[in-house]
């Protein structure tokens, strides 16, 4: 299995064509957080550019994946809006995990999300049409990538995690 996690490349089609031409099984670009928090959490990234990057890759036939860190101060409505935005961009795989502050210089944790809330988000993501959603406190970007690949290939896959 070939999984590539990429930067947004400023949504430049010629660069995204190069990535897509390599035909990885899954191309990942993480949106990381909700639109409102993007300027504070991702100082060099733009929410719209990330969505455009994912959309351009999906249009090229790539199986796209994105991830969100939760616990930064986002509301339920903002999480659901972000999931809707990702689906509209053609994203098929999504991961949701708890943000953990790596150092005191990084953005602070606003909330620790319960496993029950992660499960509710997973159910909502699947209802929106994502082929695979991993959603739990310790989920990270490439979490169970093999299961995600099986899900997008319509193979039997356990998507509970």
List where the protein language model places each region.
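Short, small-residue-biased leader/transition segments that mark boundaries at the very start
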Residues: 1-2
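Structural/interface elements that position substrates and couple domains in central-metabolism enzymes
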Residues: 6, 15, 26-28, 37
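Short, flexible active-site loops
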Residues: 33-42, 62-69
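Structural motif
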Residues: 5-7, 67
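Active-site-adjacent beta->alpha loops and helix N-cap segments on the catalytic face
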Residues: 12, 36-37, 41-52
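Auxiliary Fe-S-binding modules of radical SAM enzymes
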Residues: 21-23, 48-65, 70-161
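Short, ordered loop/turn segments at secondary-structure junctions
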Residues: 7, 31-34, 98-99, 138
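Distinct, well-ordered alpha-helical segments
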Residues: 12-21
């Amino acid at each position: 299995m070939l999984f590539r996690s990429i930067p947004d490349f400023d949504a430049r089609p010629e660069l995204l064509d190069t990535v897509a031409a390599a035909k990885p099984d899954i191309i990942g670009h993480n949106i990381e957080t909700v639109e409102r928090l993007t300027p504070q959490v991702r100082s060099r990234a733009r929410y719209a550019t990330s969505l455009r990057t994912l959309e351009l890759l999906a249009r090229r036939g790539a199986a796209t994946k994105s991830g969100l860190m939760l616990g930064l101060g986002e509301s339920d409505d903002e999480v659901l809006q972000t999931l809707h935005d990702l689906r509209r961009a053609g994203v098929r795989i999504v991961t949701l995990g708890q943000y953990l502050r790596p150092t005191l210089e990084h953005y602070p944790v606003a909330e620790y999300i319960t496993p029950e809330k992660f499960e509710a988000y997973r159910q909502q993501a699947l209802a929106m049409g994502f082929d695979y959603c991993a959603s739990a406190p310790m989920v990270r970007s490439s979490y169970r990538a093999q299961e995600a690949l099986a899900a997008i290939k319509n193979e039997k896959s356990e998507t509970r995690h």
